[in-house]
Amino acid sequence: MSIITEIQGDLFDAPEGAALIHACNCQGSWGKGIAATFKEKYPAAYRIFRSHCQQYLSHPQTWTQTQTSRQQSRAFKLPEGTALIIPPQPADYQPQPQPQSQTAPLSNCGRGRGRGRGRAGGGALHNSRELTALSRPAGKKHWIICLFTSWHYGRWSRSPPDIILENTMSAMADLKRQIAAAAAASSTTSPATTTTTTTALAATGGCEEEQLGELWGCRLNAGLFEVPWERTKAVLEEAGLAVTIVQPPGSGYE
C-alpha cells in the first residue's frame, strides 16, 4: 500500500497545523507557479525562506554525500538537497491590516467661491484618511516545508531532472532527520538533547509547543521544474514519509 495519498482539491485547504511541502529553488524566489501563491498567502514564511537562501548565496557552503544510486560522491551547494521547516508565522494566520489607496485632495479646495463647501469636503477627506487599512482575513496555521530540489529556476537555468530527483531524495532524508530530532527533543527537557534543528525552528519564530501536523503537498517538481510526477512520487515513497498530495481538478502544474 502506497504511503502517498493523492486527492483532488485545494492544497491550501489542508487542515489546521498541517505542513505544506513544496519544491523550491535556492535563489530565494517564489515568483511563478504555485510558489507565487505560497508567497501571497504566507509572506512572513517567504521572508524566512528568502533570508535562508541569501545567507548561503552570500557565504557559499558545500557538503558531500554519497549517492547510493550512482555509488559515487557528489558535492551539494547549500541549501541544495536540504529541507527548511518554517513554523506557522502569526503574521500569516492572524488578520493583518492592508494598505488602502487614498484620493488626493484638490489643490483649490476651500478657496474662492464655495469656501464653506470646500471646508466640508476637506473634513470628509480627513475622515476618509482615517480609514487607511482593511483587514486581511485570518488564514490557517500552516507549517511550510521547502525542499531545495533545484539550484536555480527558469527553463535554461534549472537543474537537470536527474539532479532534481537526487536533490529531492536528499531533501526528504534531511526532512526525516529533522522531524526525528524535533520529536526526540520534545520528549525530554535535557539541554544535552537540544539539536540544531530545534534551534533553527526557534530562530524562525516557531514555538516549541507547536507540533508539526500532517504532511501535505502538491505534485512536487512537476510544475516549473518539469520532472514527470511519477518519478518524484517514486522518490517520495522510498523516503518513507506519509504525504497527502493535492492536485487541483484539471490542473497539470506542481
From Swiss-Prot:
Name of the top EC class for this enzyme: hydrolase
Extent of Low complexity compositional bias: 91-102
Residue positions binding substrate: 9-11, 23-25, 30-35, 220-226
Keyword annotations: Hydrolase, Protein phosphatase
Chain spans, region Disordered: 86-125
EC number of this enzyme: 3.1.3.84
Coiled-coil intervals, chain numbering: none
GO molecular function: phosphoprotein phosphatase activity
Entry-linked PROSITE patterns: MACRO
Catalysed reactions, semicolon-separated: ADP-alpha-D-ribose 1''-phosphate + H2O = ADP-D-ribose + phosphate
GO biological process entries: peptidyl-glutamate ADP-deribosylation
Residue stretches making up the Macro domain: 1-254
Transcription regulation recorded as keyword: no
Claim: Endoplasmic reticulum is one of the keywords in the record: no
InterPro entries, per the entry: ADP-ribose_metab_enzymes, Macro_dom, Macro_dom-like
Superkingdom of the source species: Eukaryota
Function: Highly specific phosphatase involved in the metabolism of ADP-ribose 1''-phosphate (Appr1p) which is produced as a consequence of tRNA splicing.
Family: Belongs to the POA1 family.
Protein name, UniProt field: ADP-ribose 1''-phosphate phosphatase
